Amino acid sequence: MFGMGFFEILVVLVVAIIFLGPEKFPQAVVDVVKFFRAVKKTLNDAKDTLDKEINIEEIKKETLEYQKLFENKVESLKGVKIEELEDAKITAENEIKSIQDLMQDYQRSLETNTIPNHLNEEVSNEEALNKEVSSDESPKEVQLATDNNTKEHDKEKEHV
């Protein structure tokens, strides 16, 4: 304790007994012990407070690092997502346009009574029948198919 050995402590106690006397010595020892306990408690409190402050500072630094990292990641994701969304938007617009073109082709085919072949060539019903006639079917079957197609087309017009 304080760099003092047993012999040195014994010398201090003997001097204290001689100097204070046997009546005041016990009270002086109690006061000295209370003083050292108070000093020890104060030092421990200061140490704990300092440790907490250091820990809080470390946590603050760590939090700021994570915040900066998070902000950097968010910024990089914003750029990527916007580019991807623009690409998706362009693709969707192109698909919508192609669907609208197909719808217009079908609308024109219904109005002009032609069959679209999706190769941007329109084939009339008569040409289609001529192609069918050249196949193995008999003319009677072709005529029945034409009559059925006409009836179905009329029904579709009624629904529209």
Curated annotation (Swiss-Prot):
Topology relative to the membrane: Single-pass membrane protein
Molecular function via GO: protein transmembrane transporter activity
Signal among keywords: no
Keyword line: Cell inner membrane, Cell membrane, Membrane, Protein transport, Translocation, Transmembrane, Transmembrane helix, Transport
Main location group: membrane
Cellular-component GO terms for this entry: TAT protein transport complex
Gene Ontology BP term (one): protein transport by the Tat complex
Ranges of Basic and acidic residues composition bias in the record: 128-140, 149-160
Sequence intervals crossing the membrane: 1-21
Gene3D superfamilies: 1.20.5.3310
InterPro entries, A to Z: TatB (IPR018448)
Subcellular location: Cell inner membrane
Region annotation (Disordered) ranges: 118-160
Family statement: Belongs to the TatB family.
Subunit structure, interactors included: The Tat system comprises two distinct complexes: a TatABC complex, containing multiple copies of TatA, TatB and TatC subunits, and a separate TatA complex, containing only TatA subunits. Substrates initially bind to the TatABC complex, which probably triggers association of the separate TatA complex to form the active translocon.
Function: Part of the twin-arginine translocation (Tat) system that transports large folded proteins containing a characteristic twin-arginine motif in their signal peptide across membranes. Together with TatC, TatB is part of a receptor directly interacting with Tat signal peptides. TatB may form an oligomeric binding site that transiently accommodates folded Tat precursor proteins before their translocation.
Identification of the protein by name: Sec-independent protein translocase protein TatB
Source species of the chain: Helicobacter pylori (strain HPAG1)
Organism classification: Bacteria, Pseudomonadati, Campylobacterota, Epsilonproteobacteria, Campylobacterales
Gene name for this UniProt entry: tatB
